[in-house]
Amino acid sequence: MILRLLLAFNFFPSIQGTENKILVKQSPMLVVNNNEVNLSCKYTYNLFSKEFRASLYKGADSAVEVCVVNGNFSHPHQFHSTTGFNCDGKLGNETVTFYLKNLYVNQTDIYFCKIEVMYPPPYLDNEKSNGTIIHVKEQHFCPAHPSPKSSTLFWVLVVVGAVLAFYSMLVTVALFSCWMKSKKNRLLQSDYMNMTPRRPGPTRKHYQPYAPARDFAAYRS
């Protein structure tokens, strides 16, 4: 895509200034690595004390107005965009610089500067320049490596957590062991109480009923 754009626009004839045209020069190509770019448009015309309009367009047919500023050098200028671009800019004696931010890969295209003198008459603008190809590169984010301090803190927390977990396990085992011993002692005491011989209670003596002794001698006589 970029090669086709270069072939299509790099061989345009040089802009020839005429009485009704302004000469504008741009860099042929800008590479964007951090989603921001500054595009300077140099013109050979004295805009001082004149009402003018400076704008930046996107696409081979300049269909999208990226950024624009209206005014003159005696009043503050506000760069703005009506198409969703994050733009700002700066005016110089012979240069208009457009600051574009938060660019995306799909916004890679050719961009054209346009300078117009609105007042006083006659109306003047520039011939279409060769343009500037803005190539927005895709960003690849690498995971940040933890610093030595954060790594040390992490391992300290891991060791402390392991010690606390081990201590909690020991306390749990000790409590369980004590509970089992206590339960066993209660069972032994209960069995001992059941096996202890009981003292017999008082028993009644059974006496034979009294019977008088018989005198066998009387029977003999």
Curated annotation (Swiss-Prot):
Q: Which positions carry the signal peptide feature in this UniProt record?
A: 1-19
Coiled-coil intervals, chain numbering? none
Instruction: Pull the Cytoplasmic topological domain ranges from the record.
Output: 178-221
InterPro entries from the UniProt entry: CD28 (IPR008093), CTLA4/CD28 (IPR040216), Ig-like_dom_sf (IPR036179), Ig-like_fold (IPR013783), Ig_V-set (IPR013106)
The regions listed as transmembrane in this protein's record are 151-177
Do the record's keywords include Transmembrane helix?
yes
Q: Where is the Ig-like V-type domain?
A: 29-138
Q: Which UniProt keywords apply?
A: Cell membrane, Disulfide bond, Glycoprotein, Immunoglobulin domain, Membrane, Phosphoprotein, Receptor, Signal, Transmembrane, Transmembrane helix
Any Pfam family from its record, for instance, is V-set_2
- Residues with Phosphoserine modification: 190
Q: Which GO terms describe its biological process?
A: immune response; positive regulation of interleukin-10 production; positive regulation of interleukin-2 production; positive regulation of interleukin-4 production; positive regulation of mitotic nuclear division; positive regulation of T cell proliferation; T cell activation; T cell costimulation
What are the disulphide bonds in this sequence?
41-113, 67-87
**Entry-listed glycosylation sites:** 38, 72, 93, 106, 130
Query: According to its UniProt entry, what is the function of this protein?
Result: Receptor that plays a role in T-cell activation, proliferation, survival and the maintenance of immune homeostasis. Functions not only as an amplifier of TCR signals but delivers unique signals that control intracellular biochemical events that alter the gene expression program of T-cells. Stimulation upon engagement of its cognate ligands CD80 or CD86 increases proliferation and expression of various cytokines in particular IL2 production in both CD4(+) and CD8(+) T-cell subsets.
Subunit structure as annotated in this protein's UniProt entry: Homodimer; disulfide-linked. Interacts with DUSP14. Binds to CD80/B7-1 and CD86/B7-2/B70. Interacts with GRB2. Interacts with PIK3R1. Interacts with PRKCQ.
- What this protein is called in its record is T-cell-specific surface glycoprotein CD28
Which organism is this protein's natural source? Oryctolagus cuniculus
Per the UniProt record, the lineage of the source organism begins with:
Eukaryota, Metazoa, Chordata, Craniata, Vertebrata
